[in-house]
Amino acid sequence: MTNYSSVGRLCRVVNKYKSDFDVNIHRGTFWGNYVGKDAGSREAAIELFKKDFIRRIKSGEITKAHLEPLRGMRLGCTCKPKPCHGDIIAHIVNRLFKDDFQVEDLCN
């Protein structure tokens, strides 16, 4: 079921220790970055997460039904304001549900 109170707001990532959040995406949760420090750098961990997250979506392991509850939600992680795997999740959610659109989308 769609949470209409969140429709129209963008899914975004906030620091869970400095801001209110709706969904915890810290390591160890369903949405957490399981790659972690083994990747060597933050950027490498985010890139590995992105590739695997997209693979999981394509394989059906993560479905639209999993992602829809994240619409308009504040995803809480400890990374922010630094780059975060949650940025990948938020971007995909916003694009999938057209909550984040391009000017070209207005012409279609």
From Swiss-Prot:
InterPro entries named in the record: DUF4326
Domain of life where this protein originates: Viruses
Protein name from the UniProt record: Uncharacterized 12.4 kDa protein in nrdA-td intergenic region
